[in-house]
Amino acid sequence: MLKYILSLCLFFNTLILANDFEDFEQEYQKKEVKDSFYAYNKAMSKFNYDLYTYFLRPVALSYKSITPSFIRTGVKNAFDTTRSSFRFINHLLSLEFRKAGEEFGRFCVNVIFGFGLLDSASKTPLKSYEADFGTTLGKWGVGSGPHLVLPLLGPYNVRDALALPVNWFMVPEGYIENFWVGAGVNAALKLNELSFEYEKIDDIYQNSVDYYTFIRDAYEQRRQELIK
């Protein structure tokens, strides 16, 4: 049962980390998306919607109600600090040395002046740029392939789905010997982040004429922007 619950908590990973839907709505341009698995994707999207609505969202709201804001903010900043090395490595693999340098600089500032718990780097000109092994493959010319909705994890495409195992071993919890302990740590961090982001996700589900199509197009457009 514990393993099942921990797995469920991973679902909204992509909704939070792989998309900035508010920015997307401002710059969105309609683009045809290859959706070879449409029927499956549509059904899995409905499954993930129900999972979010009836399990993840209530858990996140309960967590928010009992956890002081400064603790949640500290955990969120610590989570982002642990991801600096992840982004740094992918920038190097993509030969984007300026972005890698900025990411390294942000990490140093946050660790030295914020003890990893404060986003001290936000007060500097240093920027953080989203990157993962899927975007690295894209920058080296690997095509995205058809859109693919994964159970629990949400929207992906074939390239990004194949990059998931590499992504896992680029983050600290991927090196915890017991996989389910590592997954539990990851799930707890993502649950904390959902406590900040649930209103954006609610807006997508409630105000989109067809949330599956919107999320699919938003995901693919965002990923394309990241590899330019």
Residue ranges and their predicted role:
Residues 4-13:
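Sec-dependent N-terminal signal peptides
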Residues 78-155:
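Mid-length scaffold segments of soluble, non-membrane domains
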Residues 20-32, 135-228:
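A structured, mid-to-C-terminal "fold-capping" secondary-structure block
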Residues 54-70:
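Membrane interface segments of multi-pass transport proteins and intramembrane proteases
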Residues 16-18:
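Boundary at the C-terminal end of the N-terminal hydrophobic targeting segment
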Residues 29-40, 49, 68:
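Short, membrane-interfacial amphipathic segments enriched in basic
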Residues 73:
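A small/polar active-site loop signature that marks catalytic segments
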